[in-house]
Amino acid sequence: MRNWFLSWVTTGSLEMKIWLIRHAKPLVEKGLCYGRLDVRADQSLTELASDNLMNALSESSGVKVLFTSPRQRTKQLANLLAQRLNISLVEEELLAEMDFGEWEGHLWEDIPKSAIDLWTEEFNDHPFGGGESTGQLLNRVWLLMENAKRRHEDQIWVTHAGVIKAVQFIMNNGEPYIKSAADWPREITNFGDWITVDITT
């Protein structure tokens, strides 16, 4: 787990925490591009992640709501956590993984290098595989973060690696626009792991 801090300039001074949790390992072939595909996660690893999270979340008893991506692999973990914490569960499409278009369901190694090169050369604007651009991902995550500030309360988000990286990028750069693929966060949150985000609203 790693803590990040971001302070937006607003009229208030209330600090809130967001738990950004990645789903457990999905039941897919290694190296598969699965983005928006609705695949399940390993149930035993999901339960293990839930146990690990409960130990950490016991320190944040004030959390009243959990938001989850609507994909099966995230809802498996979200449902367990919501039941164990006895808090509200809300499905949020904006928390879904990036849409990789026609390349979803293909192995990354089988995707033409020319397609990946075009994406990295126009990283903010190019819709990879005809799906979603990195800029579109960043803008919807920016909206989520703005909505979170307005709630003025700690939250749990059960989501995906791409969304977590988008949050990290926005926190480091202060805007939902990326100039180069080289600026994209390299650190990956492991399956079933999490980071926390402290925001001053």
Regions found by a protein language model. Give the residues of each.
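Short, Lys/Arg-enriched N-terminal segments with co-localized hydrophobic residues
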Residues: 3-15
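Generic beta-sheet signal
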Residues: 18, 64, 151-162
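Loop-to-helix element that buttresses phosphate recognition and phosphoryl-transfer chemistry
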Residues: 18-76, 130-141
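Phosphate-coordination/substrate-recognition cap region in phosphate-metabolizing enzymes
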Residues: 52-115
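Active-site catalytic microenvironments for nucleophilic, acid-base chemistry
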Residues: 80, 84, 147, 170-174
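Short glycine/proline- and acidic residue-enriched helix-loop micro-motifs
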Residues: 116-135
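GST superfamily/GST-like fold recognition
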Residues: 161-165, 195
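Domain-level recognition of soluble alpha/beta enzyme cores
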Residues: 174-201
